[in-house]
Every structure is written in structure tokens, then in C-alpha cells.
């Protein structure tokens, strides 16, 4: 929805899926002259996973398409807006991700038919959203990395170290 405003930098990230994309999103959001929104996948104990495997679960969420990684850069300085779809196409079924979490698995114990039906609906939703995101990436292709952005990334990294 924030992408529809046209002036908001928007990124969806998951550090466990792509630390580099996470860093790029924060640097780009900070450099953006306007509002920025970063939507981060954050595992928590309420998901019903062993927290030791949180980053792995983030990667599974991305690999199945439940949490695609993307960045939207609004038009600026004469450059057209860009939508970068940073994750690959879904490569595993949502079941491989969802049933690692008690919050999803519980329904299989009490109402297995409903759980199977809802999992099918979730997979259909993933497929539909992926189609929308690939369409956006084709409509607003990314230009090559701007030297100014690369320079600001180097500067930010040198300030951290």
C-alpha cells in the first residue's frame, strides 16, 4: 500500500534469508529523501519454534514465497521508480515452512481437513502475490547500482567499523 503513494521507499526484508539485502534496504532507506518503510520478518516465541532456528525459519518463509524480499525505490533525481524483487521464485511448498511452527501445525491436530484446505488457499495466495510482484519488477526495472549509493554504502560501513 505504501508503494502506491509513489514517494515512499519500501522494503520487505528477512535477515535470515538475505543479510546483504537487509543491509542494502537499511542503507537505501536512510539515504532516501522522504519517508521510508522497512517491513521485517521477525520470528518470535509465539510462532512455536525453537528460537535457535529462527534465522533458518526466516529463510524458509522466503524460499516458499510466504515472505518475498523486495525493495521499491521511488522516482528521484530524474530516475524512474524501481521495484527490485530480491528473492528467487518460490522453490518449496508452504507446508515446508508453515508446519515447522506450532501456530500453524495446531490445526492439523484438531481439524486436519480444514488445515489442508487452508494450506491450499495459502499456496494459491503465494502464487498470486508472486505474479503481482514479478509484474511490478518487469514494469519498474532496476537500473544499475548508482555510484552515489555505492559510495554511501562504503561510507556507512566505514562508520560502523
Provide a role label for each language-model segment.
Residues 1-89:
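Glycine-rich ThDP/TPP pyrophosphate-binding loop and its adjacent helix/strand module
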Residues 55-161:
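Conserved acidic/glycine
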Amino acid at each position: 500500500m505504501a508503494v502506491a503513494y509513489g514517494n515512499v521507499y519500501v522494503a520487505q526484508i528477512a535477515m535470515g534469508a538475505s543479510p546483504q539485502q537487509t543491509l542494502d534496504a537499511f542503507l537505501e532507506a536512510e539515504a532516501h529523501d522522504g519517508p521510508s518503510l522497512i517491513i521485517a520478518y521477525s520470528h518470535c516465541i509465539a510462532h512455536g519454534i525453537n528460537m535457535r532456528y529462527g534465522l533458518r525459519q526466516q529463510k524458509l518463509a522466503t524460499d516458499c514465497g510466504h515472505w518475498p524480499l523486495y525493495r521499491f525505490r521511488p522516482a528521484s533525481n530524474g530516475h524512474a521508480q524501481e521495484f527490485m524483487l530480491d528473492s528467487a521464485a518460490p522453490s518449496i511448498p508452504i507446508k515446508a515452512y508453515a508446519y515447522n511452527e506450532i501456530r500453524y501445525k495446531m490445526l492439523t491436530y484438531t481439524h486436519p481437513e480444514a488445515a489442508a484446505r487452508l494450506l491450499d488457499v495459502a499456496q494459491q495466495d503465494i502464487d498470486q502475490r508472486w505474479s503481482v510482484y514479478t509484474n511490478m519488477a518487469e514494469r519498474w526495472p532496476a537500473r544499475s547500482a548508482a555510484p552515489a549509493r555505492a559510495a554511501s554504502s562504503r561510507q556507512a560501513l566505514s562508520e560502523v567499523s
